[in-house]
């Protein structure tokens, strides 16, 4: 079907991948399309309750590039005072799919992105996409077991099996606060893989202290030093074999040392803030 791109909406379920594409990426794709044409049709489904309107299922990068081409053509007409004509990119051939469940639509989006984008460079996006894909394959109409869903993920993704297993473990088994600090890039993936070796209670206790460190002034040397010291201590707790009593003793001491250092850093921050305030009067 030939559809006007103004009648096609972006899919909110694709928001996870949207940040991976820069304006420069879209501009390069637009140049390719202008030169070689649209090699792959957009895939859309009818928008319920809105006759003639569609929602995108596959091809968001292409849709954004087409919009850019239309904009460029319009600008050229205005600058050169040419007759106002519809851009050749305003209407494009689309594949229209019908009768998919909401879950099937999301699985379609994730499957396409996990295949086409290869090894997604953004750790958070890759991890969240992999987890969503596996979770949705366990729902109707697929109803796969967790093991079957994970196998299906490994078949569509070019990432190696260990990377996928670790990503799913971080998304499903890591303390939510630690995972949020990873998403915010305060912690890194290797560190969080280590924290999976801690018990859930230990993870929660460590997370509470890491949150306090993250709240310190990002520009301060102390923030980085305290974080590095606690990271090293947590690695030691996670990896070294000790009796339960000795492990708890080492773990508690590491948290206390970090708490003390945080207190000192806050005192320094407050003093610096007071000096700045005095200078401003």
Segments predicted by a language model, with ranges:
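Short, charged/polar connector segments at secondary-structure boundaries
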Residues: 1-95
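Amphipathic, charge-rich alpha-helical segments that serve as recognition/docking helices
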Residues: 17-20, 27, 64-173
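Amphipathic alpha-helical extensions and coiled-coil-like segments
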Residues: 132-136, 161-280
């Amino acid at each position: 079907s030939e559809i006007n791109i103004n009648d096609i909406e972006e899919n909110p379920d694709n928001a996870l991948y949207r940040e991976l594409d820069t304006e420069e990426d879209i501009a390069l794709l637009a140049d390719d399309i202008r030169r070689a044409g649209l090699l792959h049709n957009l895939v859309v489904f009818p928008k319920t309750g809105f006759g003639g309107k569609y929602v995108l299922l596959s091809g968001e990068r292409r849709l954004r590039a087409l919009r850019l081409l239309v904009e460029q053509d319009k600008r050229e007409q205005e600058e050169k005072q040419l007759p106002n004509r519809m851009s050749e990119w305003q209407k494009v051939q689309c594949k229209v799919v019908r009768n998919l469940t909401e879950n099937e639509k999301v699985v379609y989006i994730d499957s396409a992105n996990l295949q086409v984008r290869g090894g997604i460079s953004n750790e958070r996006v890759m991890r969240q996409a992999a987890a969503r894909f596996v979770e949705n394959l366990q729902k109707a109409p697929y109803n796969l077991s967790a093991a079957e869903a994970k196998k299906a993920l490994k078949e569509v993704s070019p990432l190696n099996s260990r990377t996928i297993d670790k990503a799913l473990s971080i998304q499903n088994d890591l303390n939510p606060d630690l995972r949020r600090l990873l998403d915010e890039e305060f912690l890194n993936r290797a560190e969080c893989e280590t924290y999976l070796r801690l018990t859930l209670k230990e993870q929660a206790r460590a997370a509470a202290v890491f949150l306090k460190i993250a709240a310190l002034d990002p520009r301060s040397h102390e923030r980085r030093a305290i974080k590095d010291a606690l990271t090293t201590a947590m690695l030691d707790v996670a990896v070294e074999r000790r009796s339960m009593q000795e492990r708890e003793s080492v773990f508690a001491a590491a948290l206390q040392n970090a708490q003390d250092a945080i207190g000192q850093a806050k005192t320094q921050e407050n003093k610096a803030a007071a000096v700045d305030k005095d200078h401003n009067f």
